[in-house]
Amino acid sequence: MAAPTNTNLTMTPYAWGMLVTLSIVWGGTFFFQEIAVQELPVFTIVSIRVLIAALLLWAVTALTGNKLPSDAKIWAALFLLALVNNVVPFTLIVWGQQEISSGLAAILNATVPLFTVLIAHFVTTDEKLTRAKFAGVIIGLVGVVAIIGEDALEGIGLAVLAQLAVLVASLAYTFGGLYGRKIQAMGLTPLGISTGQLLASSVILIPVALLVD
């Protein structure tokens, strides 16, 4: 493991505000999905979610004078990112929330940083494990085992499968985040990447929802 580097970890009030806002918005999706799964099928929920987001970001892209990529290779990369970072995790989480609460789903989804720390060590050159990171990962994983443990002892029922589905979704987010770096190196802005992958997700999910749901 590499020795820790000196990094400025000071956060400004603006950064804290952005973090709190993001937490509220991101956490709120679990609450609304818990309500939605009582009335709508899984693929319909996920399709509506990505379509609304895609249209909003498309509008922002147009209003700010930005353009979507025209290169076929970039779109191929965006479709792969959409699959790993949107389609798979969104579907697994919504499916899981048919059996577990929004709070538990959110807690399990918070394992993304744990998976990222571990996987980034092997696939990046600038994010190696330190002793502190490794200790944090171990503590986090012990917490996850403690959360799932009681249900798992009663057998692999739907509740356990739902929790495992959310964990697999977290793992997908990890690979999506790391792959997103490669796409950014193609010259796309964060707005372009987000808009492109959500449009691609809509193209993938809407036909599936129409056929399956």
Regions found by a protein language model. Give the residues of each.
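Juxtamembrane helix-entry segments on the extracytoplasmic side of multipass membrane proteins
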Residues: M11-W16, Q38-F43, S47, S70-A76, ...
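Residue-level signature of transmembrane alpha-helical cores of multipass secondary-active transporters
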Residues: M18-L19, L78-A82, V94, A106, ...
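Juxtamembrane helix-loop-helix junctions in multi-pass membrane proteins
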Residues: I24-A54, W95, S101-G103, F175-A200
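Specific transmembrane alpha-helical segments of multi-pass solute transporters/efflux pumps
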Residues: V25-Q33, W58-N109, V142, A146
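Membrane-interface helix-cap regions at the ends of transmembrane helices
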Residues: F32-I35, E39, A53-S70, L141-G157, ...
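Specific alpha-helical transmembrane segments that line the substrate/conduction pathway
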Residues: T44-L55, V84-N85, I93-A132, A169
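Hydrophobic transmembrane alpha-helices of multi-pass small-molecule transport proteins
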Residues: L57, F79, T111, I119, ...
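Transmembrane alpha-helical segments that form core, pore/gating elements
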Residues: L57, T116-L118, F122, G155-V212
